[in-house]
Amino acid sequence: ILAAGRTGAEGPGAAASDPASTGAGDPYTPPEAITTTPELLEFVAHAAAYAREHGREKAAVAFTDPNGTFVAGNTHVFAVEYGGTVVVDAAEPGIRGTDISNQTDPFGIRFAERFEETARFGRGYVSYMYPNPANNGTFEHRIAVVEDVDGTYYVAAGLFASQGEVYPSVALNTSAGQPALEDLVAYVKSAVAYARTNGKEKALAVFNDRTGPFVQGELVMMAFDYNGTNLAAPPYSPELVKNRINLINYYDPDGVYTIRGMRDFATEGGGFFYTVVKVRANDTVVYVPKIDYAEPVDGDWWIFSGIVVPEYARIGPGNLTGIPVRDHTREEVYDLVNRAVAFAQASGKEAALAEINDPAGRFVNGDLFVWAESTDGTVLADPFWKEAIGRNCMNDTDRNGMPITKVGIEAMQNAAGFSRALFPNTAANETAEVPKLIYMKAVDETWWIGGGIYGLEVE
């Protein structure tokens, strides 16, 4: 999923059948265990088709039949009305009729809202965290396929990270030359020019041609409408475009909503955006930083492509020498920022800024710390970057031209608050820009608090 900028996904991942042409009467036997998103997509497509043909009540009975075709190992179908009332959930039958619209995952995501938004576009993938009953109720990353049934409710099924590839791993192309940033920009601009000259239909046909001129090693094209529905996909993810998968609520392993973020950039004329790709380097899993570049074609659709940040391409063959590794977790930065926001709301702005400015204060844990900015991008407090206090950073970019503050604010306002940048570790008085996962949260309508963790996640 979202592997633009790589050479191919590893492991199983054949294209699923098209839900638009899947009838309830078509023969279908689910696999013993679902381990890939294409399998999950087909599973949900048949559930939606069955519900359309047989009606809600009969479908609810069928979905809970442990010996039926809508239970595959630990994967089952659930159905929810628009508005958040559960129609049926085979794994949790007691919640039928319950309103789940305000339920959140550990990072504050109202996942039912994300389900509903995606389902209204037809079908798509939604990322969230949920307790896995097969793993003692431990919260795990989960990806759900959701599909509208009749405009009043949707069906869905989810895949936990312990069951399969929620974030598919890829193989980096180590034999071909590594594209530079200017190659990426030129590639996307050439695709935009081609689309504007030749029209949408012809351009999408060429972009989706796995032997066509826009498949150039690591450089491959992805296209979306402004709802986040896929129009063109890499050769190794044909199910995305075949099934018109909506990805507006798909996020990367750190909760960064990649398509939503790039869509927002595209509406403003385009720009750079960071995500990560899961790479298996020898016996190690590394989440390697990737830089994407997006541009609008017109008012109907936009495109992007991406490359591994060049200095990290050597991770592919297993060279981890000198790679900055995280000392903290996403959970830690989320907790620290939320504690700082709560302190500010309880103690007032003056006390909070004084505490944030203290390098030995309660909101500093090594190179995990918080800072504060006003909504116009002016730095109000920082325990280490003292020369920035009072300066407006709204238009500041990293060395690749990615606007750090703007991206963070858009993530805070439109997604879940997580974004990425390349930034020096100021707690260690370093000047080299390294990958940083940032989390930001508003205190009130006038200012916000942010924190971040440096380095790459290595498993």
Indicate residue ranges for each PLM-predicted region.
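N-terminal membrane-sensor/transducer module of prokaryotic signaling receptors
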Residues: 2-4, 15-459
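C-terminal region of N-terminal signal peptides and the immediate post-cleavage residues
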Residues: 6-10
